[in-house]
Design a protein with these regions (language model features):
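Conserved glycine-rich cofactor-binding loop
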Residues: 6, 13-15
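Short C-terminal tail/terminal secondary-structure segment
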Residues: 3, 143, 232, 243-256
Length: 256
């Protein structure tokens, strides 16, 4: 379905981003990976799916590096047809105790990077009259949770950016939608599980159940693979008139 198209996925060396990158690769899209940590492993996983893969290590808090990444992708593959804004970090603290530098970093990486990547991708998408921007927001783009002020603010901003981007391109072949996962057992969430296990003096498995029980009625983690299939749908002809939605995959979290 996506042969001869290129997908750039930020924050894609692990977790949700890698799951989405692999799902798009299975549909034939060439992939530009971005992120920190192990790079060769994810590249090998994508190559094994029979597509081309490239990597750019842009720091998503730095606009100049984002611009370099977008230029790199265009030079390597012609243009970015599918942009998945997934890069994200987390910090937990009460508002009055929240470190200012952590606030600034979360807003920069979780929200502002999506703006910069989108503004740079849209002109070529519009020229081709086809493009997909998929913003990985969060259930926290729809509801709040205590001690996550920066993350919740950023993800609400991502949902707002999604709506505006969709409206501005509504008469073109360029769509923009957001994915809003509940709990996904990524390295980011595993840190929260570990902290809860220590705080409660329980096993890691018990801490996972406590975490799910607080918010997610299904008592199941959403998987990167499931989120990847939703991204594939957003890239399919069936989604041509799906524009500006914030699609939650959250086990019933916001239905309560």
């Amino acid at each position: 379905m996506l042969a001869n198209k290129t997908a750039l996925v930020t924050g894609s060396t692990s977790g949700i981003g890698l799951g989405i990158a692999k799902a798009l690769a299975r549909q034939g899209a060439n992939i530009v990976l971005n992120g920190f940590g192990d790079v060769e492993g994810p590249k090998a996983e994508i190559l094994a799916l029979g597509v081309q893969v490239a990597y750019h290590g842009a720091d998503m808090s730095k606009p100049a590096e984002i611009e370099d990444m977008m230029k790199f992708a265009a030079e390597r593959f012609g243009r970015v047809d599918i942009l998945v804004n997934n890069a994200g970090i987390q910090h937990v603290a009460r508002v009055e105790d929240f470190p200012v530098e952590k606030w600034d970093a979360i807003i920069a990486i979780n929200l502002t990077s999506a703006f910069h990547a989108s503004r740079l991708a849209i002109p070529a998408m519009r020229a081709a009259n086809w493009g997909r921007i998929i913003n990985v927001a969060s259930v926290h783009g729809l509801v709040g949770s205590a001690e996550k002020s920066a993350y919740v603010a950023a993800k609400h901003g991502v949902v707002g950016l999604t709506k505006v981007t969709a409206l501005e391109n509504a008469t073109s072949g360029v769509t923009c939608n957001a994915i809003c996962p509940g709990w996904v057992l990524t390295p980011l969430v595993q840190k929260q599980v570990d902290a809860k296990a220590v705080a409660l003096g329980v096993s890691n498995e018990e801490a996972k159940n406590v975490l799910l029980g607080e918010k997610e009625p299904s008592m199941q983690f959403t998987t990167p693979e499931e989120l990847g299939e939703l991204a594939v749908f957003f890239c399919s002809p069936a989604s041509n008139n799906v524009r500006g939605v914030a699609w939650n995959m959250d086990g019933g979290w916001v239905a309560q």
